[in-house]
């Protein structure tokens, strides 16, 4: 229920472009560094190194030691996306894929702001959005669900080193709604089930 903070929605579009930044920020998907480094116009990486890092890092430092001014993300401008409908399309797609969630839509707002504001103003906007989300009902509910799921997987008083049992078959007594649902869960997991109605 949150957006990336600490300037993430403002810096990433500056170093990777709007389309890539939108995809990463709204989905949270990992992208291999080699793929990002090969993207045209990317400024996230100065250099990727295969093999021994130390000699390559020293050589790189020597190469740029005399360069002034050093490039700064602060000075990079964000080009508006080539597709003028990119932000509207992203919002429409998120309305379908992340139905009812506020944060992904607000991510799009922040990335769009990066194309219109300087870095400081963009970070201020991002901070306001983040603060509005972190105290909101949806973020609180999602945090509650997150911790609830983890708590549900931990049974009190059962030692962590308790060996797992291999379940080979299951019997469910009661073929009502609940029994049918339990039966389907086991069948979907490939475990044979005997369903008994008493």
Regions found by a protein language model. Give the residues of each.
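CoA-thioester-processing core
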Residues: 1-25
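Phosphate-binding active sites in nucleotide-utilizing proteins
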Residues: 149, 162-198
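Amphipathic alpha-helical segments at domain termini/boundaries
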Residues: 19-127, 143-162
């Amino acid at each position: 229920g949150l957006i990336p903070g600490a300037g993430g929605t403002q810096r990433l579009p500056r170093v990777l472009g709007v389309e890539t930044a939108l995809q990463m920020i709204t989905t949270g998907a990992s992208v291999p560094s080699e793929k990002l480094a090969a993207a045209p116009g990317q400024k996230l990486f100065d250099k990727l190194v295969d093999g021994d890092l130390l000699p390559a890092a020293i050589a790189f430092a020597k190469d740029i030691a005399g360069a002034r001014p050093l490039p700064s993300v602060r000075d990079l401008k964000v080009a508006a996306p080539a597709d003028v409908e990119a932000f509207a399309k992203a919002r429409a797609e998120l309305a379908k894929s992340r139905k009812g969630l506020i944060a992904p839509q607000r991510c799009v707002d922040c990335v769009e702001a990066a194309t219109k504001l300087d870095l400081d103003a963009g970070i201020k906007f991002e901070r306001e959005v983040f603060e509005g989300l972190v105290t909101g009902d949806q973020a609180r509910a999602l945090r509650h669900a997150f911790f609830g799921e983890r708590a549900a997987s931990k049974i009190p008083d059962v030692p962590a080193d308790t060996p797992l049992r291999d379940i080979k078959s299951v019997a469910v007594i009661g073929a009502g709604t609940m029994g049918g649902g339990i039966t389907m869960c086991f069948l979907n997991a490939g475990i044979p089930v005997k369903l008994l109605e008493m």
